[in-house]
Amino acid sequence: MKDLKHLLYFENLLQNANNELIEQAKKDGKICAAFTCENIPEPLMNLGNAFSVRLFAPNTGSLDIATYYMTSFLCETSRALLERAIEGGFNFADCLIAADGCTMMNRAAENMEIGRAHV
């Protein structure tokens, strides 16, 4: 039971995409390489002054905005990531890396890039 308090700490980190570990790394001047898929070679993104973060969207409510830009036939995960990106939830990321293995995630990443270009 003593170890459960440590598990709670890590569980709380997962409540926000931009958690205290990411904020500390950014304060230390590190570059955040955000990625969308487990097929990305994560060790290669953690070289030098970079650190990697797999994007996720905890506590997502409505997907209305993302569904406007992407069809409702695409998976909820890709739409949730786009919804969170539109809300500004991934502004901590310095770059976005998306694998070419999933058309739905590619579509979400393309919309994120288009949205960022207009900001």
Regions inferred by a protein language model and the residue ranges of each:
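An N-terminal assembly and electron-transfer interface module characteristic of large anaerobic redox
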Residues: 1-118
